[in-house]
Amino acid sequence: MAKEDAIEVDGVVQEALPNAMFRVELQNGHEVLAHISGKMRKFYIRILPGDRVKVELSPYDLKRGRITYRMK
């Protein structure tokens, strides 16, 4: 997935799942399964349920995404 093709949306983490996966509810009400991006994993950025995050979605699979930013 090229970065230009990604769709960026905001959401709220609903649930933490095994293997650094999270269930995220987007602003439009949809729920997606998202994993942490490599840079966030490298710098040990913690994500907890209730955190507001920025998620990148692939145009090919809108049910899976990558968490790229945790908002303060």
Swiss-Prot record:
Chief localization: cytoplasm
Keyword rRNA-binding in annotation: yes
CC per GO annotation: cytosol
Domain spans labelled S1-like: 1-72
Keyword check for rRNA-binding: yes
One Pfam family linked to the record: eIF-1a
Keywords assigned: Cytoplasm, Initiation factor, Protein biosynthesis, RNA-binding, rRNA-binding
Superkingdom, natural source: Bacteria
One GO molecular-function entry: translation initiation factor activity
Subcellular location: Cytoplasm
Complex and partners: Component of the 30S ribosomal translation pre-initiation complex which assembles on the 30S ribosome in the order IF-2 and IF-3, IF-1 and N-formylmethionyl-tRNA(fMet); mRNA recruitment can occur at any time during PIC assembly.
Protein family according to the UniProt entry: Belongs to the IF-1 family.
HAMAP family in the cross-refs: IF_1 (MF_00075)
Function: One of the essential components for the initiation of protein synthesis. Stabilizes the binding of IF-2 and IF-3 on the 30S subunit to which N-formylmethionyl-tRNA(fMet) subsequently binds. Helps modulate mRNA selection, yielding the 30S pre-initiation complex (PIC). Upon addition of the 50S ribosomal subunit IF-1, IF-2 and IF-3 are released leaving the mature 70S translation initiation complex.
Protein's recorded name: Translation initiation factor IF-1 1
Organism name: Nitratidesulfovibrio vulgaris (strain ATCC 29579 / DSM 644 / CCUG 34227 / NCIMB 8303 / VKM B-1760 / Hildenborough)
